[in-house]
Amino acid sequence: MKKIVLVGYMASGKTEIGKLLSKKVNLPFLDIDYLIEESLSKTVNEIFEEKGEVFFRKKEHEVFKNKINSKQSFILSLGGGTPCYAENHLFLQKDDVISIYLKGSVATLVDRLKMNKDKRPLLKNLANDELAEFVAKHLFDRNFYYSHCKYTIIIDDKSPFDIVEEIHKILF
């Protein structure tokens, strides 16, 4: 049984890499945001707007805990904040979990986030010139939680295919 959990900040490529890895290793790919949306029949943006972040984080924890304690094999992409709440970071160190932090520099992440920040509840009200400071602060605050991953892969200047190859080497 393989439980591969991809961790990283917004726009680190978790979803794209998860989908590519899924095809390569023949495991189902799951995205925690999609699982939450499916369980509530609402988008993440709608959940944030209607119920607030605290409600969202509680639901996120419940979904993550249920999935990680299941007997299934999968590749799971977490939200950027998932490890930082409700002691979710402790699940990253379970014996049957392979947790991988996709680590990007502030510059890389800001470049990627500028393209679709309207789809990100935490960013949609920020001006582009505020993004770098916001991302840098978040990365600093979240480093403790992200560092609980068993593996770290630097994503700067690498294609998704190169990153998938690095992960494949870890797995096999």
Curated annotation (Swiss-Prot):
Amino-acid positions noted as binding substrate in the UniProt annotation, renumbered to this chain: D33, R57, G80, R142
UniProt keyword annotation of ATP-binding present: yes
Entry keywords, A to Z: Amino-acid biosynthesis, Aromatic amino acid biosynthesis, ATP-binding, Cytoplasm, Kinase, Magnesium, Metal-binding, Nucleotide-binding, Transferase
Catalysed transformations (reactions): shikimate + ATP = 3-phosphoshikimate + ADP + H(+)
Cofactor binding mode and count: Binds 1 Mg(2+) ion per subunit.
Sequence positions that bind ATP: A11, S12, G13, K14, T15, E16, R120
GO cellular component, one term: cytosol
Stated role: Catalyzes the specific phosphorylation of the 3-hydroxyl group of shikimic acid using ATP as a cosubstrate.
Required cofactor(s): Mg(2+)
One GO BP: aromatic amino acid family biosynthetic process
Gene3D superfamilies listed in its UniProt record: P-loop containing nucleotide triphosphate hydrolases
GO molecular function annotation: ATP binding; magnesium ion binding; shikimate kinase activity
Presence of keyword tRNA-binding: no
Assembly: Monomer.
Main enzyme class: transferase
Pathway: Metabolic intermediate biosynthesis; chorismate biosynthesis; chorismate from D-erythrose 4-phosphate and phosphoenolpyruvate: step 5/7
Protein name per the record: Shikimate kinase
Family per record: Belongs to the shikimate kinase family.
Upper classification of the organism: Bacteria, Pseudomonadati, Bacteroidota, Flavobacteriia, Flavobacteriales
Coiled coil: none
Subcellular location: Cytoplasm
